[in-house]
Regions:
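Methionine residue identity
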Residues: 1-3
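Basic polycationic patches enriched in arginine
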Residues: 10, 18, 31-33
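Short hydrophobic alpha-helical segments enriched in small aliphatic residues
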Residues: 5-7, 12, 16, 24-25
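Fe-S-dependent hydro-lyases/dehydratases of central metabolism
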Residues: 34-905
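Cationic, low-complexity basic patches in intrinsically disordered or flexible, solvent-exposed regions
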Residues: 20-22, 898
Length: 905
């Protein structure tokens, strides 16, 4: 049999079996590792037991516990409860002595998914079942070990705006029609896989449901109390960090790893304390605070860090406010953004209808286990930052980055607001074509939503109206929002201004803003108008919100309503006149509600029974239907949504030589996963649109790129399909980089659309590399940003820096991340795209490798690069060809061991 270069024997379409890495010894694949017995003791006042992490820490270093931050305490408990006993002391020492000399395991309690990455993860597991069956294994044995909760929230596009009284029903009907293939597959998964719970479409956003109901904060399982921890297939999973729950956003590949019972191996992260001082000024929302914090924390370079917010300012914030801050952790680059458990936590659990018994357990455990905020007074951090809440003014962020904060008072000085003219009913320069109250970032904060409702009421009383070209919408992350708005009498006020409920889903925040009115779209095209979107979301990257919104601004929900009235971003929102009432000029200050009224309405209108009314039936619909399913999915050959994945066969099962690689693209700083694999609407003239038309889909049912990620033939055509891409290999006659989804095929030097270039290289079996600047792969945690480049034939990416989740996804797909050393960039190397590249050296965690660059002149340049396989586990996954190949190898190895007869003497 032919040998793979890393010592694996090829067998059929799978790499044959490989000896497991030493740190996995004793881990039984696809089974939960049992809890330990040491340091287990009764939890006072309950009939439960808990693991005394403090005693374990003090056994290593007396007095160390009081200085440990919240993050370290939760991870210490996880180790004491779940780590291999033989490894416990060594792993725990990393935390106690704040070392980063070795990896330690983390066993999250849950996996939470939205339907896009959750679906692709389950497509991978269904494909893994096929691969296992092809090799004679039992496909029914492939099941998630860790509980998986999948919430369908990413599929709905706002085709009908909030001014249509039937918008919700119409949008849901369109969602069901477009996604029948996907929902059929998800329904099969619910029955065919064990340990998978599905919340169907139309019920809310995963993070808000997680915050309001799914997270218990403290689990009580088999007589043991322990902290809730989780990974989620979305970068905004830290939303629930507001409750003191360590929740980390991961890609679908890493989530699959956790689903199947594997530890998530890590090194001690940087833990940064952020002391919040002061109190916010009157009229300032949590949105204003988080946008100011995002700017501040980006400047402080907290990428990859775990943040712990504390101090008097933190204590004054409600869980709704804290969740707004925690939600945007990926925007300021942090892995987690935690608030310790305190009275605010208990108040929120009461407000959201948790049981008295659960609330009592949270308080008892937190106080006994050292997770109560008061027990952290002596905690020591690697860095201490301070932020004054009283310094925050009314803010927006834009036009294309969440950390690009601009005070509304400075809009004119920044050149955003300025002179504009309106000719009758035609759209002005800078027209706001989308105004969306959207996203769990803000709609899980009752204060923000109620502020928008009160501003709408005040505007209605003064005769102000939405401009006719503004597509307005309200898409809360939970049905409870509609209940408390109705209770407060504010739902009708929002509807009057065009902000009726269009969905309980992600919608515009995820780029699912839907089609514009055809006449408005045509006017934009004919007049080449500069148009914008204003939304209460968390991201505004170029091209994300809508193809015809050239720029987008993030703002609080009440500001979104105000901009729907103003109608243009050129409007000075603080000073210009919104309208006249009885001859009086009306400005923003005249309709902005007072803090006292917002708080009074929130206190009177948001009630525990609303949450119970919504969630008790939602979580009661998962009883076993009694229908048995085949363990193998019956793939639909004509589907453009769900297709058997190719990761165990063909080119992807072949070797990666890391030799003779040509650059597919040379890219600037801040390349996002939206550049790598966009999620918004598919246009007819795109490669994916042409493919879908060829497959017989009408253009109105193309749906979004995101919804087709279960079919690799459609999804791979999204690779670098963002029209805002700048590939520095493609320049015009004056040497200026051209914008667009373009590539230059070498050695011919022919410029063509990116997909055609990828097809050309695939047909040639040409290995590829990508060269990039700093912060490569920031943004959403979409695994297709890695899958797409791997399917294209990319074997390595050399960049000045990587965002955490995307780097992990690249490794999970068998793509080698390489980081230039400080001072080395694509510019200092004078690359023009005609070069070929080799990677030389032994791949080990953090090793220095050599990038050989061969130029057309015959010259060779040798460049040291850092191997960004950061742990032994990552090396193991990479060498296996990726996490999916590793699953199959290890499953068959375990299956083979179980079938081997034991010799008795």
């Amino acid at each position: 049999m032919p040998m793979h270069p890393h010592g694996q024997v090829r067998h059929g379409t799978l790499f044959a079996l490989r000896e497991l890495q030493p740190h996995n010894a004793g881990l039984c694949l696809f089974r939960a590792r049992p809890m330990n017995t040491s340091y287990r003791q009764p939890l006072p006042g309950t009939d439960l037991q808990f693991f005394n992490a403090q005693a374990a820490v003090e056994a290593i270093r007396p007095g160390a516990w009081s200085r440990l931050p919240y993050t370290s305490r939760v991870h210490a408990e996880n180790l004491v409860r779940r780590c291999e006993p033989a490894l416990l002391t060594e792993c725990l020492t990393q935390i106690v002595e704040r070392k980063r000399e070795r990896d330690f395991p983390w066993f999250p309690a849950r996996v939470v998914c939205h339907d896009i990455l959750g679906q692709t993860a389950l497509v991978d597991l269904a494909g893994l079942r096929d691969a296992i069956a092809d090799q004679g294994g039992d496909p029914a044995a492939v099941n998630p070990v860790v509980p998986v909760q999948l919430i369908v929230d990413h599929s709905l596009a706002v085709e009908c705006g909030g001014y249509d009284p039937q918008a919700f029903e119409k949008n849901r009907a369109i969602e069901d029609r477009r996604n029948e293939d996907r929902f059929h597959f998800i329904d099969w998964c619910k029955r065919a896989f064990k340990n998978v719970e599905v919340i169907p479409p139309g019920n809310g956003i995963m993070h808000q449901i997680n915050l309001e109901r799914m997270s218990p904060v403290i689990h009580a399982d088999n007589g043991i109390a322990y902290p809730d921890t989780l990974v989620g297939t979305d970068s905004h999973t830290p939303h629930v960090d507001a409750l003191g729950v360590i929740a980390v956003g991961v890609g679908g590949l890493e989530a699959e790893n956790v689903m199947l019972g594997r530890a998530s191996w890590m090194r001690l992260p940087e833990i940064v304390g952020v002391r919040l001082t002061g109190r916010r000024q009157s009229g300032i929302t949590a949105t204003d605070i988080v946008l100011a914090l995002t700017e501040f924390l980006r400047q402080q370079r907290v990428v990859g860090a775990y943040l712990e917010f504390h101090g008097e300012g933190a204590r004054s914030l409600t869980i709704g406010d804290r969740a707004t801050i925690s939600n945007m952790a990926p925007e300021y680059g942090a892995t987690a953004a935690l608030f310790a458990i305190d009275e605010q936590t208990l108040d929120y659990l009461r407000l959201t209808g948790r049981t008295p018994e659960q609330i009592a357990l949270v308080e008892t455990y937190a106080r006994e286990a050292g997770l109560w905020a008061d027990a952290l007074q002596a905690a020591e951090y690697e860095r201490d930052l301070e932020f004054d809440l009283s310094s925050v003014v009314r803010n927006m962020a834009g036009p294309s980055n969440p950390h690009a904060r601009v005070a509304t008072a400075d809009l004119a000085a920044k050149g955003i607001a300025g002179a504009w003219t309106q000719d009758g009913s035609s759209m002005p320069d800078g027209a706001v074509i989308i105004a969306a109250i959207t996203s769990c970032t803000n709609t899980s904060n009752p204060r923000n939503v109620i502020a928008a409702g009160l501003l709408a009421r005040n505007a209605n009383r003064l005769g102000l109206v939405r401009k006719p070209w503004v597509k307005s919408s309200l898409a809360p992350g939970s049905k409870t929002v509609a209940l408390y708005l109705e209770e407060a009498g504010l739902q009708s006020e929002l509807e009057q201004l065009g902000f009726g409920v269009v969905a309980f889903a992600c919608t515009t925040c995820n780029g699912m803003s839907g089609a514009l009115d055809p006449a408005i779209q045509q006017e934009i095209i004919d007049r080449d108008l500069y148009t914008t979107a204003v939304l209460s979301g968390n991201r505004n990257f170029d091209g994300r919100i809508h193809p015809y919104a050239k720029q987008a601004f993030l703002a609080s929900p009440p500001l979104v309503v105000a901009y729907a009235i103003a109608g243009t971003i050129r409007f000075d929102i603080e000073n210009d006149v919104l309208g006249l009432y009885e001859g009086r000029e009306i400005r923003l200050k005249d309709i902005w509600p007072s803090d006292e009224e917002i708080d009074a309405v929130a206190n009177a209108s948001v009630k525990p029974e609303q949450f119970r009314t919504v969630y008790e039936p939602m979580f009661a619909i998962h009883a076993d239907s009694g229908i048995s399913e085949s363990p193998l999915y019956d793939w639909r050959p004509q589907s453009t949504y769900i297709r058997r994945p190719p990761y165990w066969e063909g080119a992807l099962a072949g070797e990666r030589t890391l030799r003779g690689m040509r650059p597919l693209a040379i890219l600037p700083d801040n390349i996002t996963t939206d550049h790598l694999s966009p999620s918004n609407a598919i246009m007819l003239n795109s490669a994916a649109g042409e493919y879908l038309a060829k497959m017989g889909l009408p253009e109105e049912d193309f749906n979004s790129y995101a919804t087709h990620r279960g079919d690799h033939l459609t999804a791979q055509r999204a690779t670098f399909a963002n029209p805002k891409l700048f590939n520095e290999m493609v320049v015009d006659g004056e040497g200026k980089v051209r914008q667009g989804s373009l590539a230059r095929v070498e050695p011919e030097g022919q410029v063509m659309r990116m997909w055609e270039a990828i097809e050309t290289y695939m047909n040639r079996k040409q290995p590829l590399i990508i060269i990039a600047g700093a912060d490569y792969g920031q943004g959403s945690s979409r695994d297709w940003a890695a899958k797409g480049v791997r399917l294209a034939g990319v074997e390595a990416i050399a960049a000045e820096g990587f965002e955490r989740i995307h780097r992990t996804n690249l490794i999970g797909m068998g793509v080698l991340p390489l980081e230039f050393l400080p001072g080395t960039t694509r510019h200092t190397l004078h690359l023009d795209g005609t070069e070929t590249f080799d990677v030389v050296g032994q791949r080990q965690p953090g090793a220095q490798l050599t990038l050989h660059i061969y130029r057309t002149t015959g010259a060779r340049t040798e460049v040291p690069v850092l191997c960004r396989l950061d742990t032994a586990e990552e090396v193991s996954i990479y060498e296996a060809g990726g996490v999916l190949q590793r699953f199959a190898q290890d499953f068959l190895a375990e299956n083979s061991k179980q079938k081997t007869p034991v010799a008795h003497t």
